[in-house]
Every structure is written in structure tokens, then in C-alpha cells.
Amino acid sequence: MSNPKAPTATEAAALFLSVNNIEVVYDHVILVLKGVSLDVPRGGIVALLGANGAGKTTTLKAVSNLLHAERGDVTKGSILFDGVEVQSLSPNDLVRRGCIQVMEGRRCFAHLTVEENLLTGAFTRRDGKSAIAQDLERVYAYFPRLRERRGSTAGYTSGGEQQMCSIGRALMSRPKMILLDEPSMGLAPQIVEEIFEIVKDLNVKEGVSFLLAEQNTNMALKYANYGYILENGRVVMDGEARALAANEDVKEFYLGVAGDKRKSFRDVKHYKRRKRWLV
């Protein structure tokens, strides 16, 4: 896939996040991302799709500047968040500027209560207890289930409640953009739908932008405006969400559907091997 042309000044002003041809290496040896470029506009929901190991989580960690903890480095390219080079900022500086990541696997503090977990999200704030209390109520308005479980130990809540807690904790930092990693992982379909509806509400009502890494292609494209497909550390396809959802390659490769007929896992594997655009 050819590299996208540089955006015009008007286009650049409309972008919240611009990832430009980045390469990521772990342990100075393992090349994981191989020239990834993507954009997230202000107020947009962008889906980052691909199978396990495609490079989605690494891309998010590059944006949130968390690679160093795993001996990873961006060795080529640039990442701009709201016009500022990400590599010049610490992760906590990024949070203060409005960019926060909700990690894969929820990562709640199991020994703390739900409310204590939420309050940790306000750690970088300096605007006083009253403002933080107001935002806590705002989180409970989006997640009524968390209000009911506010005094419960987070480690004893359900997977769906922990995912809600993780997103609520991110909201406590007053983010402009949330990097959301595999929100549907291990959750029942009804809970997944509920979480994605909340993501949509946050986008529409609060103006929060999202970069959403997700293996559930169908669900992600239902709520996203635009999508990028990663394979083997490269962007192999991108486009408007509706166009990707209707694309025959996407349907056959990721959804296992040819026309109206669902294919077997064996057929899908064969299809993956013979498609040249995924080399």
C-alpha cells in the first residue's frame, strides 16, 4: 500500500492524531510495525482492525508513548497529537493534554473499590475536589451499573463492569481522545453492544474522539466513521466504515462470509493464504 500524501494545512488542522509512516522495534531486533500511517479527525471514531498479532496494540502504545516499558521504540516516522510530537512527551503529559489509553484486559486495580478505581483516573488533575466530584457523577450517569457497585471491590465485579470501570476511569481525566484497546474481548454480546453505545454517546455528547483497536470487525465498523486494517504490521486497507463493511474481501476474510453464505474456519484460512493483498 502506498504511503498517503501529506495533508494540506486545512486538513492538518482538522486532525487530532496523525501517525506518519512509523516503524516500531522491540528489543532492538524485532520489527513489529512497518510503516504504519493513520489519522483520527477531531470528533471522529476510527477503527483499527486486524487479527491477533497484527500490530493494533503496539500502534496504540506507540501513540500513548508506553512502548518503553516493554522495551519498544519508534525508530522511524512521527506521531502528532493535537499538533505536538508524542515522542517529546511523557505518558502523564499526554494524559494532561487529553490523550489516554484504556488498556486491553481492563487492568482495574483489583483490591480497590469501583469508586476508588474511578478516582485514580483524576490523578493528573489540579482543578479541585468539587470538579472531580462533578465528573464522578457524570461517569455514573453514563454507567449506572457502576453507581450501584461503587463500593464493591473491583476484582469481584463482572468483566463488563470492569470494562465500564476502565472507560469511566479514563473519563475522569477529562480526555479529548481515548485509545480503546479490544473493548469487546471476553464479553457477552449484549454487554459489548451496551459499551459501544456508550462510546457513541461520549462521541456525540462530549465530543470525545476514539481510536478503537478491535477484532470484532462487524461491531467496530457499525460504530466507526473510518477504519484501517492491519496485517503483519502494515496497513493493507483503509476507508469509510460503510465501504469497508460492504467490501467483499473484508467480509470474506474477517467475517467468514461469501455472499450470504457463512464459510468454515478451514475455508477462511485457505482464503487468507491465497489473498495477495495481505502479503
Tell where the protein language model's regions lie, with residue ranges.
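A short, proline-enriched helix->beta-strand linker immediately N-terminal to the Walker B motif
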Residues: 172-176
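ABC ATPase NBD Q-loop/coupling interface
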Residues: 66-67, 78-96, 124
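The feature captures the beta-strand-to-loop junction immediately N-terminal to the Walker
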Residues: 49-51
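ABC-type ATPase nucleotide-binding domains, specifically the catalytic core motifs of the NBD
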Residues: 27-28, 67-70, 114-134, 142-144, ...
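ABC ATPase signature
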Residues: 112, 157, 170-171
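Helical segment within the ABC ATPase nucleotide-binding domain
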Residues: 193-207
